[in-house]
Amino acid sequence: MPSKPRIYIETSVISYLTSRPSSNEGIRGCQYFTRYWWENFAEQQFELVSSPIVQQEVSLGDRAASQKRLEVLEKLTLLDTRKETLDSLSDDLINAGALPLKARIDSFHIAIAAINNVQYLATWNFKHIANINKIPLIQQVCRKAGYQPPILCTPQQLLMEDF
């Protein structure tokens, strides 16, 4: 039996999975797709991975809410990446203009997934990660550094795929 593809679960996915339904219709839709994908497909189709950086991010904020996020994260394998390697690819992404300096944490998510040869990165961050205008440059920078870039996608997009 072939192994499942790995998917890096970024902070926004965990936040949408565990938060109360938003009053914003668009965000509420993203929350719905996230919960539906998570409950019906995520573990069946993928090996779920994340990182200590996500762990740090989800531990911030309201104590009860952060506890719910951390409980989800406990079930995932956390990928460890050498700081020097992580910083190098992150710097490459920022220096190439794929992400702005203020999005350093977002560059870490992409770098961790690429360095660990993770096939997919699930996110709702369209500004810096799943930005259709930046994806080609992100891919180019990762490949130039010797890494296969992950496919940057949302849980909604994953519902439309046949794995």
What are these regions (language model features)?
Residues 1-50, 59-70, 95-101, 135-138, ...:
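Short, well-structured N-terminal submotif of metal-dependent ribonuclease cores
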Residues 130-151:
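C-terminal end-helix/capping segment
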Residues 52, 82-83, 155-156:
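Residues at the C-termini of beta-strands that transition into short coil/loop
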Residues 146-163:
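Short, C-terminally biased terminal segments at protein or domain edges
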Residues 77-135:
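Active-site neighborhoods of divalent-metal-dependent phosphate/nucleic-acid chemistry enzymes
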